[in-house]
Amino acid sequence: MKEKTGKPQAFSRHLIGKSASEHLANFNQLLAGMMGSAENKPEALKDITAVEVSQANFPALISAAMLGEFGAEVIKVEPPEGDPARKVSQYGVKVKGAGIPFLMESRNKHYITLDLQSEKGRENFKKLASRADVIIDGLKPGFMDSEGIGYRQFSKLHPGLIYVAISPYGHFTSKARNFRNIPDTDLTAQAESGYPALIGNPQAPEPYNYPLKAGVWAASYMSATLATAGTLTALLHKRRTGEGQMVDMASSEAISIWQGFSIAWGFTFEMPRVRVGNFDWCLFPYGYYQAKDGFVTVAAASDADFRGLLKILGRWDLENDWRFLFDRITDDVDKLKVLEGEFKKELIKFARKDLVRKTLSYSAGAAKSKLRGKGFPIIVETLSPREVLQEEHWQVRNSFLEADSGLKGRLKIPSSAPKMSESPPRTKRLECGIGQDNDKIYEKYGLLK
């Protein structure tokens, strides 16, 4: 394939040509300017009011914080003694009167106290709901309805309201009824999803072959993200029709869906997908490997990528034994371990940055080649949390914010992941005192003191 127009040509999924580097450099510079400061830029949800009422429900806390980042006025309703989630923290450390997990999800929120089991508290909540666009209910299923302030009541009084309920099992199954008093925890949500059964070393003997949970609150963040997506979709529907609706989010369902094809695998092949550890059922190599000074991530999605990886490592001799796709993609773990052992012997000889440099050099040459099938293997460094915080790349993207912790040093917390040119998310405040905004919100919404 020749360059007839003088413009960069595309081979596979890569841009090549003499002007490609200049083009990408200019484009990067343009985007860097567009994705910079959020100052003086509009907020996408500026006209939206969301009321969050939850106790010890981190998916609800996280979802409400996401709406707040995009400009919604988020009012966090707590009982007079505060949300029990405030007490969750490593080593009992409190920042600004709350545990770090709670503080992180306090972005841009207003905090008020209401006793929903009192007549005055319920009347005040009704006043809030009458002017709200969204309610996020993170209490036990059925509690709000039993107090006369749930979706069933508000759908008649306020038909445009979007009512988002987040709980372990949702609201409308027999299990949801039977387990309604079980608190929402990330651990139980993972357990009910089948996900922990897929994690761990497949070769581990008894008693080490037990299920493993993800090292982060995966179910909480996944269910919060999906609940937020449901909320935004419901807002679009309301814009077209004027109709509100209920969004029912079950946290265990969220992480079940997150597994993707793992669930479908059992139905398709009439066999469960078992744990494969550092292997993958569809790709090989596709995992973490020891280098001279740490770990690297190695991925070769296609045969061409695999051959490119062999060339980078100087092990072209292996191609004769493993040249076909199904020689590498197999559920025979013992067979995979043979090839993995060869990779381990080579990767341990190199420093991480040297492996990355060699891979980038190979990919640059492959992109310029007029021959298809050169392959683009991937080798990147596997980073520790400390290394992530030190990465210049994430600093340029403003991926982490610094906040006054009241302790020695400043607190670093994750910022919003999507970078947007016209209506970017932002963190304007990080305060979460119990009832700190009572006076302001009570006056604004005409609540009874």
Regions found by a protein language model. Name each.
Residues 33-36, 291-294, 351-354, 364, ...:
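An anion-binding loop in the catalytic cleft
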Residues 81, 168-170, 251-256, 293, ...:
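Glycine-rich beta-alpha junction loops
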Residues 211-222, 244-246, 276-277, 284-286, ...:
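A short glycine-threonine-serine/GTX helix/turn-capping micro-motif
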Residues 235-277:
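Substrate-binding/catalytic subdomain of NAD(P)-dependent oxidoreductase enzymes
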Residues 270-281, 286-287, 408-411, 430-434:
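Short Gly/Pro-enriched turn/cap motifs at secondary-structure boundaries
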